[in-house]
């Protein structure tokens, strides 16, 4: 047995997960995921790589509860996502999962300040935006991602790399069980990408968060503890 897996509990499990889409003109189903099984240990940084159309984005969507598989089981910790109602699934994503997307437009709300963007998940969960603990957590995370003193500005005043660092801070603000990152460095220059990848790796090694990153970039994948390769909807 792999020692790395044996000493840690599972943060994420997929068992025989398949995702099939509706028939196209050819009359055949499109199989985006084909009987995928894997276990991601708690506190690890895992990269999922593969060419365009390999199924890696569908893997992330099913693993994060953004899409329901056609068959198979997905668990976050001990929670089977298949048994959850849409409302319960929304609460789980809000409370136990953090997200970092490739698009800055998806990551941040331009009408909110940088600090308000960071603490937004806490506010959506019912915290008062002006509460001392909420503000302190937001400022502490901005300091950690190298943006101390910038919280009062708008995200549009930041570079793409700085916006992604804000997105990482927001993903961590709820102290999630799992952070899912979808091509988080795809539009960044090498220096900015390195900063973002360092923050994700630090979240796993320092905080014990489980990070699952989808990427087409082998350099980015090299920052992870484990690399899963997808091709044709299957893990290779």
Please state what every model-predicted region is.
Residues 72-80:
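Conserved ABC transporter NBD signature motif
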Residues 110-120:
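Short coil-to-helix segment of the ABC ATPase nucleotide-binding domain corresponding to the Q-loop/switch region
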Residues 154-158, 162:
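Conserved ABC ATPase signature
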Residues 175:
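Conserved catalytic motifs of ABC-family nucleotide-binding domains
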Residues 190-192:
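Helix N-cap at the start of a conserved alpha-helix in ABC-type nucleotide-binding domains
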Residues 81-98:
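ABC ATPase NBD coupling module
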Residues 179-182:
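Catalytic Walker B motif of ABC-type/P-loop ATPase nucleotide-binding domains
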């Amino acid at each position: 047995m792999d020692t790395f897996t044996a000493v840690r509990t599972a943060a994420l499990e997929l068992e025989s997960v398949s995702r099939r889409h509706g028939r196209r003109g050819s009359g055949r189903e499109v199989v985006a995921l084909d009987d995928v099984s894997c276990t991601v240990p708690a506190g690890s940084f895992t990269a999922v790589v593969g060419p365009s159309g390999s199924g890696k984005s569908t893997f992330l969507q099913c693993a994060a509860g953004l899409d329901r598989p056609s068959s198979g089981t997905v668990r976050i910790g001990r929670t089977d996502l298949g048994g959850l109602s849409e409302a319960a699934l929304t609460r789980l994503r809000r409370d136990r999962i953090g997200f970092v997307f490739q698009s800055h437009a998806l990551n941040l709300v331009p009408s909110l300040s940088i600090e308000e963007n960071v603490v937004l998940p806490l506010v959506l969960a019912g915290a008062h935006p002006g509460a001392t603990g909420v503000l302190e957590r937001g400022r502490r995370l901005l300091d950690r991602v190298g943006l101390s003193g910038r919280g009062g500005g708008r995200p549009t005043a930041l570079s793409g790399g700085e916006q992604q660092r804000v997105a990482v801070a927001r993903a961590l603000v709820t102290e999630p069980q799992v952070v899912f990152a979808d091509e988080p460095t795809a539009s960044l220059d090498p220096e900015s990408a390195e900063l973002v990848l360092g923050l994700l790796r630090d979240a796993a090694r320092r905080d014990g968060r489980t990070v699952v990153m989808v990427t087409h970039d082998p350099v980015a994948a090299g920052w992870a503890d484990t690399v899963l390769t997808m091709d044709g909807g299957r893990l290779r």
